[in-house]
Amino acid sequence: MRKIIHVDMDCFFAAVEMRDNPALRDIPIAIGGSRERRGVISTANYPARQFGVRSAMPTAMALKLCPHLTLLPGRFDAYKEASRHVRDIFSRYTSLIEPLSLDEAWLDVTDSPHCYGSATLIAREIRQTIFNELQLTASAGVAPVKFLAKIASDLNKPNGQYVITPADVPDFLKTLPLAKIPGVGKVSAAKLENMGLRTCGDIQQCDLAMLLKRFGKFGRVLWERSQGIDERDVNSERLRKSVGVERTLAEDIHEWSDCEAIIEHLYPELERRLAIVKPDLLIARQGVKLKFNDFQQTTQEHVWPQLNKEDLITTARKTWDERRGERGVRLVGLHVTLLDPQLERQLVLGL
C-alpha cells in the first residue's frame, strides 16, 4: 500500500507578502490584476476570505465584497524563490515529488526511511521545517492514493493535516460528497444530485455501464474514485507542458456575448500564470475549451508563437458557432501549449 502526501501552502502568495511586510498581516489583502484591466484574484488571505473574496474571482467583484481590500500586483520572483526552497525541503525526504503548481505538490514516501517510515510523522516534520526555515505555513493530507491525499489536505486548513489510513478509506468514501472529488465542479455536482447521486456511496451502488453511457469518460473516473481507485503514480519526471485557466459557470450560458465576457476575465489570469513559467510569453499553440450541458466538451487550438487575446477570442467564436448547436455552455477555458525545451533550445541556437 502506498503512502502519499499532498502538501498545500496556505494562501501562498499572500503569505509571502505578509511575511515580508508584517503590516499586511491583519488586513484583507489579495494578489491580482487591476479592476481597470478586468483582472482576477490569484489568492487572498484569510481576513479577505471572510468577506467572500476567493481565487479566480474578478477583481471588480472582490472590491465590491470588500471595498477596503488591499490589492497587490504580485512579486513572482519572491514566490518562485520560496517555492524552490519548499521543494528543497521535500527532496530531503523523497525523490518522488510531483509539483502541481508553485504552492502544492504530491510526495510518495512509501519507501522513505525518515520518521520510522511514518507518512504522518513525515508530513508533520515537513510542515514544521517549512515554518522554521521560511516562516510560512502549509497544510497536508496523507492517504494511500493521490486524489484522497489532495482532498485530505483541505480538511484541516490552515496549518494542519489530515490522515486517511487504508482502513479509513471505505467509511470515508461512503459519505464523501461527489463535489469534493477533483474535477467535479458545482454544475456537475448539481446535475448528479438531480439524479439522486450526492455521495461516493451513491455512485458505489450504480452500474458502471450506466455511468459510461450518461457521462462518458467522466463516468469511469467517478466510478473509480468512488471505489477509492486512483492508480496514478507520483510522477517526478513530469514537465509542465501547458498552462491553462478555466471557469465552471453557476448557470449555463447561451449567448456569445456572455462567453466573450468570460474570456475577457480569464485572459489576464492566463497571462499571469504563463509569465511565471515563460516571462517572454513564447508558446507553441494556444486554444480554447468549451464544455456543454450534456457533459461533452470540445477543444480548438492552433499554432501561435505568442499569447494573443484577439486570436483566442476569434478561435472561441469559431468554436462556439460550429460546435455548440443549441446546447448551453457550462465551462469556458483558455490554454497554451509550451514549446518543447529541446526544440526551444534549437530555435534559440539558430537565431
Swiss-Prot record:
Q: Any coiled-coil ranges, and where?
A: none
> Start and end of every UmuC domain?
4-185
Q: Where is this site: Substrate discrimination?
A: F13
Q: Which residues form the active site?
A: E104
PROSITE patterns this protein is in?
Answer: UMUC
Q: Which residues bind Mg(2+)?
A: D8, D103
Q: Name one GO molecular function term.
A: DNA-directed DNA polymerase activity
Identify its protein family.
Belongs to the DNA polymerase type-Y family.
The record ties this protein, via HAMAP family, to: DNApol_IV (MF_01113)
Q: What is this protein called?
A: DNA polymerase IV
